[in-house]
Amino acid sequence: MNFHRRRYPYYNRLRRLLPLVIAVSLSLLILFAFLSFLAPPPGDSDRLPPRVRYSSNDAIKATGFHIPRAGGRSDRDIWRSRNAEFFFGCSNASSKFANSKAVTRNDRYLVIATSGGLNQQRTGIVDAVVAARILNATLVVPKLDQKSYWKDASDFSHIFDVDWFISFLSGDVRIIKQLPLKGGRTWSTSRMRVPRKCNERCYINRVLPVLLKRHAVQLNKFDYRLSNKLSDDLQKLRCRVNYHALKFTDPILTMGNELVRRMRLRSKHFIALHLRYEPDMLAFSGCYYGGGDKERRELAAIRRRWKTLHINNPEKQRRQGRCPLTPEEVGLMLRALGYGSDVHIYVASGEVYGGEESLAPLKALFPHFYSKDTIATKEELEPFSSYSSRMAALDFLVCDESDVFVTNNNGNMAKILAGRRRYLGHKPTVRPNAKKLYRLFMNKENTTWEEFSSKVRSFQRGFMGEPKEVRAGRGEFHENPSTCICEDTEAKAKAQLESRKLGKKNKSTNKDAAVTVTNDDQTEEDDPDWSEPDYEEEQSDLQDRGLYNGTSLDYDDPSTSDEPELEAMLSD
């Protein structure tokens, strides 16, 4: 009995404390739940950024930057230039342009030695015909460069149809295959060079006196030695040479046309990309592409081969638009312009710096990726593969026939093709507005794809190869042959009248204003560097110092360095 009395107070105390313990516990649980509700979610900085992954099956993704597989909506036909049907090539001589038989002097012979790659030599051949006409001289079929970096033993007749060349131009300039004999011996020529951009007066004052005295003159290293500003008849003669008289040989034409046919079998439309991304090209440009110390060491080693090559400021080069676009940047530009992953691309290029690693982003964006080596067998290419100029001619033909031609750098082949495509119908020719695009590429991961693609389309207006895109007389004539492009004003007026009848005048005007932009409407900052010399011309001038003040005689100098000619290596 006493035992139960002792336990009673203990149970009473426990019974009174239990509600208090329960109340405190519930309060703590409620407080914890309330704090959990108010706490912010884990920050973005705590998450690992998604890894950039290139795949042809999925959209390429980067932080905040999602690249679509499709080209997306576009306010233009991506396979043709607006209003191209109202413009056409016109290069016939005027009635004032006398026949060659009436002006050619029988005691004047002009020999031309070209330099550089195939397309740089092409500019020399075209200008050689005009120079002979200025001097009223007989032109000997130009000599191709066989001694420079390319070491291609091909002569004119291996690349071009020489008989067609002579016959087509017979009314303009008398052309012969070789110098005639003089007293039973080969004629001795006086060798000389002329300044860059030499005009008619320049040839009359500097070359003609030597020609009158020696009767046979050889102009060496003949590239860009004729002014861009000549009389209309001489400019039209340039066009007749470039777009009609210079025809590739039958073997080159046959193989080139077969490559085009195979591309057409794969797709109705295709893009041709001339990709200049060789190690030597990048070393010369002085640009930096983010490859770290490895890239700096490799390109610096290449630069050391040329004592005359100064080191450029990489950032300045980018700002001035002098850095070739990377393969990835070309792909992004094309996607932004409306070309989807289903588009087929033919790539004309030499050795690509970084190899497959550099090409991977472009191939991920455009998996239908071809070159002459992938659509032709080694046996088919064997007659051409040992000759760089013949291989370049095959690429030229495919690029010329492509629906859209794109370049990542404005070299000789890009310039020649741009002018040719303007003359033959203004097929789309995309030249990157590198001055504007470089900042966009650098900051792409800080923007959305929609904003990025909109800016690319805006920046590329005036750089798409459309009619009247460049003011007449601007830049290299081979790139902008404005004298040889005529407008069908009657057809254009008729089309505008029909448009008004259909009540579409305002819509048509607005669309034209949104797409067709001339350089007259662009600021100086936006204007392409048409008047600036490209890398080939700059480097040639290192070897031609002093020529602008006088014409120099050209002798073989045994002390000349054996290092490769940089201009020839970088020309195309």
UniProtKB/Swiss-Prot annotation:
Disordered: annotated span: 498-572
GO terms assigned for molecular function: glycosyltransferase activity
Compartments where found: Membrane
Binding site for substrate: 274-276
Pathways involved: Glycan metabolism
TM region positions: 17-37
Glycosylation sites: 92, 136, 446, 506, 549
Compositional bias of kind Acidic residues: 521-541, 554-566
Enzyme class: transferase
Protein name per the record: O-fucosyltransferase 16
Organism: Arabidopsis thaliana (Mouse-ear cress)
